[in-house]
Design a protein with these regions (language model features):
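Conserved, mostly hydrophobic/aromatic
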Residues: 33, 78, 136, 166, ...
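Conserved phosphate-binding/catalytic loop of the ribokinase/pfkB sugar-kinase fold
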Residues: 84-109
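Metal-associated gating/positioning segment near the N- to mid-region
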Residues: 1-55
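Active-site flanking residues adjacent to catalytic metal/cofactor-binding acidic residues
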Residues: 5, 167, 226-227, 326, ...
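His/Asp/Glu-enriched, well-ordered alpha-helical/loop segment
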Residues: 186-195, 215-226, 232-324, 328
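Active-site mouth loops of central-metabolism enzymes
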Residues: 11-24, 91-98, 142-146
């Protein structure tokens, strides 16, 4: 396959851009993501205080300049802060802000390399979203609906401002009703908008729900991501209510406190230990293929071609042809990862 591109990854294994907010966390992601089949990615932030998001941006600038070996950092995906607290999911409610174009301009101007500001998740129904979306459209920043209570009509209206897709489709958004299609219905209806699916495990989105989207949208309008966080790198405590586990920093270890009372400790710097904490990109691909009717060409589109086109990186990524970066992910006939180049 052309190298897998993860456009929604907060962290992986021994590095977490979201939790640690350091250049070293990104270097760790560059180093270890190839073990998961990923050759390039967008470091993804969360709904945090603005100054902390700006710290992330500066770290991304630094690592992009260094261009370390491993997976290439293509830029930043700003997941927030302009999201709806009603659908905050695991984001901080106090950091879910009303869209403000002045704040957006401040974030954008923090980037030394403006091309790194590639993607933003936003709740388009909130006051001020139109101005932020116009700004993003003018500066070639891809935008997606996410953590949103938007109605079908609100999304229909905001598409004029460049809305291109939906973040972790069906999760963290207003559901479908036959008289008000909601955010989820809009995701299925607008055939020119991308549906991003995060770590298609069957846990956050059932396999049947994914299959439904696949039948309606087709493989050319789906992007597979992981939304991995690098959970072992939590700086205090992170409650993963879907998996019913709390990740608690305990000196130089991380304690996994299961809701049923079971506890286990892992070393957050031990790659072999922490890689088991979250499903990798390569495992997600295999899992998706095991439970749906996707073919090899579909996988290529969802993992490489579509994400490259979506974030305007298809001049060098996403396909195998002369002049493109020679990023390759090699899997066997069972879709087990062999190696990457």
């Amino acid at each position: 396959f052309p190298g897998f591109i993860d456009i929604h990854v907060h962290g992986w294994a021994t590095g977490s851009f979201w939790f640690e907010k350091t250049s070293q966390s990104l270097r760790e992601m560059c180093r270890t993501l190839p073990f998961a089949g990923v050759t390039s990615y967008l470091g993804t932030t969360g709904a945090d205080p603005i100054e902390e998001i700006k710290t992330c941006i500066r770290a991304a600038d630094q690592v992009s300049e260094e261009d370390p070996e491993g997976a290439q950092l293509l830029g930043v995906h700003l997941e927030g802060p302009f999201i709806n607290p009603v659908y905050k999911g695991m984001q901080k409610e106090e950091c879910c802000l009303l869209p403000d174009v002045t704040v957006m301009e401040d974030l954008y101007n923090t980037f030394k390399n403006k091309k790194l500001c590639r993607h933003m998740t936003i709740a388009p129904e909130r006051p001020g979203a139109d101005a932020v979306l116009r700004f993003c459209q003018e500066h070639q920043i891809q935008t997606a609906v996410g953590h949103s209570a938007a109605t079908f009509e609100e999304i229909k209206k905001m598409r004029a401002y460049g809305l291109g897709g939906f973040t972790h489709t069906f999760s963290g958004m207003k559901g479908f009703h036959h008289r008000e299609l909601g955010t989820a219905g809009a995701a299925l209806y607008f055939d020119d908008m991308i549906c991003e699916f995060a770590k298609q495990t069957g846990m956050t989105v059932s396999h049947e729900a994914f299959e439904l989207a696949y039948r309606i949208k087709g493989s050319s309008r789906i992007v597979l991501t992981t939304d991995c966080c690098g959970l072992a790198q939590t700086q205090s405590c992170f409650d993963h209510y879907v998996r019913k586990i709390r990740f608690v920093k305990d000196r130089d270890q991380v304690c996994l406190e299961h809701y049923d009372g079971k506890k286990e400790w892992i070393d957050p710097r031990d790659y072999q230990a922490v890689k088991q904490v979250e499903m990798s990109y390569a495992q997600s691909v295999k899992n998706m293929a095991d439970h749906t009717k996707v073919g090899l060409y579909d996988i290529m589109l969802m993992t490489s071609f579509n994400p490259a086109h979506y974030i305007h990186a298809d001049d060098c990524k996403g396909s195998i042809r002369p002049g493109m970066d020679a990023d390759l992910t090699i899997m066997d006939q069972n879709l087990d990862l062999i190696c990457v180049y």
